[in-house]
Amino acid sequence: MARLMIFIMLILASGCSFSEDDAEENVVYVYNWGDYLDPATIEKFEEETGIAVIYDEYDTNESMYPRIAEGAVHYDVICPSDYMIQKMIDNDLLQPLDFDKLPTAKKYIGADFFEQSKTFDPENKYSVPYCWGTVGIMYNKNLVEEPVDSWKILWEEKYKNEILMQDSSRDALMIPLKLLGRSLNETDTEIIEKARDMLIAQKPLVQAYVVDEAKDKLISGEAALGVVFSGEALMITLENEDMEFAVPKEGTNFWIDSWVIAKDAENVDNAHKFIDFMCRPEIAVINFDHLGYSTPNIAVRDLEKDEEWKNSPVAFPDPEIYQNQETYKYLGNEMDRFYNRQWMRVKVE
């Protein structure tokens, strides 16, 4: 898929297929997480609209942000997480959406999720929820004997070289902050440094700091415990029946990834068309089946044909699981840099 998109980009750049004006009318540049939608939905969009999708991927919010801020590539549609959307709004990197051009989004994206989005998009002007979930511990029942109900298990010596941690500053530091009884949006530098030191102390036990690799390692049995997103958890349990997912009692992150349009987008109408297309129930269910991530689309559960997925407590959890969880907030550029420095300290120690 990536090679196909690069090929299309080269054609556009060379002017072989489109004039400059035509390219603006017949293309949309999308920047999304790795493997975060079914390629078939892009093909359906292109076939129906005649708009070519130039698709690029990133692995973390932090790696995505500089490319947008520096303006090296002018993407149209992006899919950041909650706190990163707030940061992009604060730094004038997004443009308000025209919801008159998003009728499907207004009809099928649950009001509860727009309400939750107000924590990072206070007026619901900039974002349309795409996926949501929690962060928890995936564990192998055959390798882990005790109940998994606390983040503390990730510091157990007996699981040395069996633990996978997220390679992301906020997702990694969130865990010791919760063990300390603090908010995952902590701004007290001494507390954050204490959380950093806990991660440094844990480091000899960690097999790897990973992003997308966690799923394959856990499915294959290469690790006994891993910090994963709930959508990955559903896919892992389907591939390996020995795996289970737990949300620790200390609390965790309730996250929302949403579609936004970049401030310097050159294909704004096409960007709206792309977002609204992805909100169609019949398209959303294809992406749900591909990803396993919980969806804010209120029609998907009824359309889902797989009874195991439809009744999955991971994909459609009891509201008690996430009602009292926190959403990441953007804490300002200075605090953002501070978090990143502490995470780099962990990585280099």
Label every model-predicted segment.
Residues G136-L143, K178-L179, W255-N267, I275, ...:
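A bilobed periplasmic-binding-protein/Venus flytrap-type ligand-binding module shared by bacterial periplasmic
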Residues M1-V27, E349:
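Short, low-complexity disordered leader/linker segments with a strong preference
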Residues H74, C79-L205, V210-E222:
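Extracytoplasmic ligand-binding site segments that recognize negatively charged/polar headgroups
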Residues I192-A201, Q207, E239-K263:
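Periplasmic-binding protein-like
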Residues F18-M88, D216:
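Early extracytoplasmic/lumenal segment of secretory-pathway proteins
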Residues A262-Q323:
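Mature extracytoplasmic/periplasmic domains
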Residues P319-E349:
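Conserved C-terminal helix/tail region of periplasmic/extracytoplasmic solute-binding proteins
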Residues M84-K87, I219-S220, L225-D242:
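A ligand-binding cleft/hinge motif common to bilobed small-molecule-binding domains
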